[in-house]
Structure formats: structure tokens, C-alpha cells
A protein has these predicted regions:
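Subset of outer-membrane beta-barrel
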Residues: 41-330
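Cleavable N-terminal export/targeting peptides
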Residues: 1-47, 319-330
Length: 330
């Protein structure tokens, strides 16, 4: 994850007080834990944010770049907001791997003229405790990472959809160190008739620099995705697949499906292939919707790190007020 202090040479260490040594040891221990348990590449700042958001998408194994038809599209593929025609409010909460790492998201999207507009807030945090060189516990603290993102999407001459995010990152070590930085995402989505769709995204283009108040810097690594989706049986069945790329090497592969047994009930499943397709883990989930209220749950079966339960809810104000048509299948 992040490094809140610049490296200390031997002369500096000799002058550090016992209290500061406890802070340094405790902070480094926490950083090692967070880096080890993060999904995806698991390296770099804001690693937990690479997991994605929303129980619906995560239950499909994260294969959502070419789907992107709900409020979480602002993270998965900002271009997807241009295919909505109502106002939506959504949120997500989870404890990653059951290890006390909280990951939350709240967002709102709407349409204006030919544009899709979104505003979201994402947060990840973990509580820790300073430990001195003798192993004795000291002060408790909470490491927090947040991002505020604004999304704009539009239709490009009826050829496809394009979208972009501007993100403001903030980090707080809980020990008096803070950092921030701006990042940018781009997304494209092309519907090939009523059945096929393809999408590509570039998140944190060229890497996002996070600057600490003390002068140190960290980087949110760039991540690039390409995906395709098929909508069958009048949109009641969705099959999707995504591929990750870090700019140098291929990353994880994501395959997922969603089947609406009836309009009000959907079942989902997916698989994520990791480590050059040598390892994998599964995801399952379900969702219900009643009069524009969508409630979704996902369960990530990650044997090594631990299982994760994700809960999400989304309101479609257009549906509730009778003012919009349903575009995506939730």
C-alpha cells in the first residue's frame, strides 16, 4: 500500500524517540498486512479499490466492463452511464475477506440531455494498533483511503458511448500523515445490435501520483480492461467476460453470468482466473427488485485470503416515480 514517511537513514534513526519508533513499526506492519491481502495485483496505493464495487457486478466475477448498466458503471465503465435514462442512488458495504477491512461506496447518477452524470464516494479502512519493538501494544488508529469521483458520459454520433472520471484521492494514516492526488479514467462501450456489446476502460491513466504531506509519494497503478457481453432471451440472460492488463502484462480474467428467473429475481455466478490462469476463485450471488428498489448480495469464495460477503442496494427514482424506462437488467 502506501508509504507515509520517506526512508530514514541511520543518523536519523538514532534521534528518533521511542514513541516514534512505535509508530513506525506499527505503521509498517499494517502496510505489510494490507498489501498482502489486497486482491488484483495487490501492489500500490489504494489496492482495495481495484476490487471493484457492487454486489451485482462482483457476483458475476467482475465481468462488467461491457455491461455497465447500473449506478456502479461509474467505476466499472464510465461510458455505461450514457445508456441509462433515469436517476439512481446506490450504495455498497463489505468487510473484505472477513478481516475487518471495510470497503464502502455511495453514488448517484442521472441523465441530462444526451449526457450521463455521476457523483460517487468510495472508502476503504482498516483499524490497527501501534506495536513497539518489544511487541507491546500502543495507541489504536485507523488507516483510511477515500476517493470522490465525478463521471460524465455521452453518446458519440450513435456509434458508441464514451465516458470519463475525475477522481480525488485522499489517505489518512490515522497517525497524523495525510496524502492526496487526482486521477483520471476513460471508458468506451459499443452495443453491436441488441445482443452483443464490447467495452474497454483505462483507469488511473499512466498511474496516479499520491503526494504525502511529508514529501513522499506513492502511485495508484494504471489498470486497463477489455470486455464483451451477450444479452440473450430478451435480456433475461447475460453472459460476460473481461480481461485485465496492467500496461505490461495480462492480468486477471473474469467470466460471469446473470439469469433473471423472473423480472424481480436474478441469480448470478462468476469465476476469476488469476496468477497467469494458474489459480482461480468463484463468486455467486442473487438480486431482487421491487418497484425500482434493487437489493443484491454477492459471496466471493476466496480460499487463500478468506470469503467476502458484499451487500448492495440501488434505487431507480425514475421507476419509483414512473418517469423512466428500465434500460439494464439488474
Amino acid at each position: 500500500m502506501m508509504t507515509p514517511e520517506a526512508p530514514l537513514d541511520d543518523n536519523t534513526l538514532k534521534g528518533v524517540t521511542t514513541t516514534m519508533k512505535r509508530v513506525i513499526v506499527g505503521t509498517l506492519a499494517l502496510l505489510m498486512v494490507i498489501s498482502a491481502i489486497a486482491l488484483a495485483d495487490g501492489v500500490g496505493a489504494f489496492s482495495a479499490f481495484k476490487n471493484g464495487i457492487g454486489a451485482r457486478a462482483l457476483a458475476m466475477g467482475g465481468a462488467f466492463v461491457a455491461v455497465g448498466d447500473d449506478a456502479t458503471a461509474m467505476v466499472w465503465n464510465p461510458a455505461g452511464l450514457a445508456q441509462l435514462n433515469d436517476t439512481r442512488l446506490g450504495g455498497m458495504s463489505t468487510d473484505l475477506f472477513g478481516l475487518g477491512i471495510t470497503h464502502q461506496f455511495v453514488g448517484a447518477v442521472t441523465t441530462f440531455a444526451n449526457f450521463g452524470i455521476g457523483l460517487g464516494w468510495e472508502r476503504a479502512s482498516v483499524a490497527g494498533q501501534v506495536v513497539d519493538e518489544e511487541g507491546e501494544a500502543g495507541d489504536a488508529f485507523t488507516w483510511t483511503e477515500q476517493a470522490i469521483l465525478g463521471t460524465l458520459a455521452t453518446n458519440i454520433m450513435d456509434i458508441g458511448l464514451a465516458g470519463a472520471n475525475v477522481k480525488y484521492y485522499m489517505a489518512d494514516s490515522g497517525l497524523g500523515d495525510t496524502a492526496d492526488g487526482f486521477g483520471f479514467d476513460l471508458g468506451l462501450l459499443v452495443n453491436l445490435g441488441d445482443i452483443f456489446a464490447v467495452g474497454v476502460t483505462a483507469t488511473d491513466l499512466a498511474g496516479t501520483t499520491i503526494s504525502w504531506a511529508g514529501g513522499a509519494t506513492d502511485v495508484v497503478s494504471g489498470l486497463y480492461k477489455a470486455g464483451m457481453a451477450m444479452k440473450l432471451v430478451d435480456g433475461m440472460l447475460i453472459l460476460a467476460a473481461d480481461m485485465d492488463f496492467d500496461g505490461t502484462n495480462l492480468g486477471d480474467a473474469h467470466v460471469g453470468m446473470e439469469f433473471n428467473i423472473i423480472k424481480e429475481l436474478a441469480l448470478r455466478g462468476g469465476v476469476v482466473l488469476t496468477n497467469s490462469f494458474q489459480d482461480y476463485y468463484f463468486a455467486v450471488g442473487a438480486g431482487i427488485n421491487v418497484a425500482g428498489l434493487y437489493v443484491d448480495a454477492a459471496y466471493i469464495l476466496e480460499e487463500t485470503l478468506g470469503n467476502t460477503l458484499i451487500l448492495s442496494a440501488e434505487f431507480s427514482l425514475g421507476d419509483l416515480l414512473g418517469g423512466g424506462e428500465e434500460v439494464g437488467t439488474e
